[in-house]
């Protein structure tokens, strides 16, 4: 950026020293090319305040010279370099009013106007720097909102996946409950079946014992009693 600012300032000096219309037109074209490069670097790179002030001062001087050139062309006056025009004005003032007091007053007025121009340029540069900071903050806020939107979308997808898994687990739990209930019923029926089978087995055993062992002994005992 420093090289571009130096080129802008050198081009402003060349514009001020231009002695013909063709030369100043060429310098205007070259200045505009350098100006485009400076605008790009100023937009996409971090620039210090003094560099912004130099940039604004060079651009304002270019605008002033361009306006002066257009006024000269519109009025039909010949183009003169800044130094020659100032010397011409001083010579005319010395002829018309050679007093030192008036010259000092006029020089003070000129210096005051330059100081006011510097104040305006400083204010404009500060506003430009503030706008650049606001632009950077807005870009950062947009990036943060985009990141938050991406995180929110990712969280939404995760919640949807968890919801689907929850519904799947709920279906599995419902099916498992039905299976457990049917297994309990099966266990109860099996228990009754086993108990009834065991009871029948005991009955058969008791019947056989009574029929084969107890009854013959009992019948013999009853026969002797008769």
Swiss-Prot record:
The keyword Protein transport applies. The modification Phosphoserine is found at residue 97. GO terms for cellular component: cytoplasm; endoplasmic reticulum; endoplasmic reticulum membrane; Golgi apparatus; SNARE complex. One of its GO terms (molecular function) is SNAP receptor activity. The chain crosses the membrane at residues 190-210. Residues 1-189 are cytoplasmic. Keywords: Coiled coil, Endoplasmic reticulum, ER-Golgi transport, Membrane, Phosphoprotein, Protein transport, Transmembrane, Transmembrane helix, Transport. InterPro entries: Sec20, Sec20_C. It comes from the Eukaryota. It is found in: Endoplasmic reticulum membrane. It holds the Pfam family Sec20. One of its GO terms (biological process) is retrograde vesicle-mediated transport, Golgi to endoplasmic reticulum. It is a single-pass type IV membrane protein. SNARE required for targeting and fusion of Golgi-derived retrograde transport vesicles with the ER. Component of a SNARE complex consisting of ufe1, sec20, sec22 and use1. Interacts with tip20 through its cytoplasmic domain. Belongs to the SEC20 family. This is Protein transport protein sec20. The lineage of its organism: Eukaryota, Fungi, Dikarya, Ascomycota, Taphrinomycotina.
């Amino acid at each position: 950026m420093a090289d571009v600012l130096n080129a802008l300032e050198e081009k402003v000096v060349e514009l001020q020293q231009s002695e013909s219309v063709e030369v100043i037109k060429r310098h205007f074209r070259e200045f505009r090319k350098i100006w485009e490069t400076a605008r790009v670097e100023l937009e996409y790179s971090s620039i210090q305040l003094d560099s912004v002030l130099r940039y604004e001062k060079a651009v304002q001087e270019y605008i002033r010279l361009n306006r002066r050139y257009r006024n000269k062309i519109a009025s039909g006056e010949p183009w003169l370099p800044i130094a020659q025009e100032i010397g011409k004005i001083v010579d005319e003032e010395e002829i018309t009013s050679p007093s030192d007091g008036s010259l000092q007053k006029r020089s003070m007025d000129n210096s005051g106007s330059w100081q006011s121009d510097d104040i305006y340029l400083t204010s404009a540069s500060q506003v430009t720097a503030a706008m650049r900071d606001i632009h950077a903050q807005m870009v950062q806020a947009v990036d943060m909102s985009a990141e938050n939107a991406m995180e929110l979308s990712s969280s939404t997808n995760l919640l949807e996946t968890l919801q689907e898994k929850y519904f799947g687990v709920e279906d599995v739990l419902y099916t498992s409950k039905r299976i457990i209930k049917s297994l309990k019923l099966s266990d109860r029926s099996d228990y009754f079946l086993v108990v009834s089978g065991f009871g029948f087995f005991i009955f058969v055993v008791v019947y056989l014992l009574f029929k084969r062992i107890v009854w013959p002994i009992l019948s013999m005992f009853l026969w002797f009693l008769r």
